[in-house]
From Swiss-Prot:
Its EC number is 1.5.1.5, 3.5.4.9. It comes from Rhizobium etli (strain ATCC 51251 / DSM 11541 / JCM 21823 / NBRC 15573 / CFN 42). Pfam families: THF_DHG_CYH, THF_DHG_CYH_C. This is Bifunctional protein FolD 1. NADP(+) binds at G168, R169, S170, S193, I234. It catalyses: (6R)-5,10-methylene-5,6,7,8-tetrahydrofolate + NADP(+) = (6R)-5,10-methenyltetrahydrofolate + NADPH; (6R)-5,10-methenyltetrahydrofolate + H2O = (6R)-10-formyltetrahydrofolate + H(+). The gene is folD1.
């Protein structure tokens, strides 16, 4: 039976490090870590996400600022707010909650955030820094950064000699995840919907990361015995056993059967999910340390 990684536990330990680093920075240089969150419109799911991010920022000891804008906000108004926050030295991280209501275009807004304040790790500058192996000045997208914490805690810092397969090639997750694994010396294959003999490719992986959004696609016979399996999928499927019209969350991995083969596995829910918000806090305190000329904490 595989060891099941408790994402909530690992996230809590990351948050503990963030709290200590926040307090130490304030003591050493008088700098309070500042996070600004921008939300446009009244989408309930977006407001729930923003609420949890703001609460966590306060819990970490950050100065947390939330800008709630009406749905009819123009592109120019939103760009103006980002420019103001870029120029504010008390703000170290800027987060724009996506998706933005139509007709707003999120891409130019995201790219206008200063790379050193881009705590979501979505700017092309930060993507480029990751691609060139610059983890000293870049910020990494939160979900792959969180998944990588699991990998490091299982295998250590150096993945030399290990084969890693990432299923999924999205800019948000697949590409940065592959890059992080490569930077740690793994031999990396990126697989996707056009990959031939996908099961065979996966069976070669010592570290298998699934991020395609297809419920329970990865079966036991896709997995090398003793592999580490990281499941990033979040899929809602019907759960008639819970009652009519009810659903449950599953990942991209058939958890029960793969648990019999893998040595380590992440569950859904409760695996990678809790790490995303923890790494957002980690990125923010890293950005604050850099701005203050201090050595940032390691996660």
């Amino acid at each position: 039976m595989a060891t099941v990684i408790d994402g909530k536990n690992v996230a809590a330990s990351v948050i503990q490090t963030v709290k200590s680093a926040t307090a130490a920075l304030e003591k050493a240089s008088g700098v309070t870590t500042g996070l600004a969150v921008i939300i446009v419109g009244d989408d309930p799911a977006s407001h729930a996400y923003v609420g949890s991010k703001s609460r966590m920022a306060k819990e970490c000891g950050f100065k947390s600022v939330q800008h709630t804008l009406p749905a009819e906000t123009t592109q120019e108004e939103l760009a103006g707010l980002v420019a103001t926050l870029n120029a504010d030295p008390s703000i170290h991280g800027i987060l724009v909650q996506l998706p933005l209501p139509k007709p707003l275009d999120s891409e130019p807004i995201i790219q206008s955030i200063l790379p050193e304040k881009d705590v979501d790790g979505l700017s092309v500058v930060n993507a480029g820094k990751l691609a060139t192996g610059d983890l000293k000045t870049g910020l990494v997208s939160c979900t792959p950064a969180g998944a990588m914490v699991f990998v490091r805690r299982t295998h250590g810092e150096d993945l030399s000699g290990l084969n890693a397969v990432v299923i999924g090639r999205s800019n948000l997750f697949g590409k940065p995840m592959a890059q992080l694994l490569l930077n740690a010396n793994a031999t990396v294959t990126i697989a996707h919907s056009r990959t031939k003999n996908l099961a065979e490719v996966c069976r070669n992986a010592d570290i298998l990361v699934a991020a395609v959004g297809r419920p329970e696609m990865v079966k036991a016979d896709w997995v090398k015995p003793g592999a580490t399996v990281i499941d990033v999928g979040i899929n809602r499927v019907p759960a008639p056993e819970k009652g009519e019209g009810k659903t449950r969350l599953v990942g991209d991995v058939a958890f029960r059967e793969v648990s019999e083969i893998a040595s380590t596995i992440t569950p859904v829910p409760g695996g990678v999910g809790p790490m995303t918000i923890a790494m957002l806090m980690a990125n923010t305190v890293i950005a604050a340390h850099r701005a203050a000329g201090q050595t940032p904490p390691q996660f």
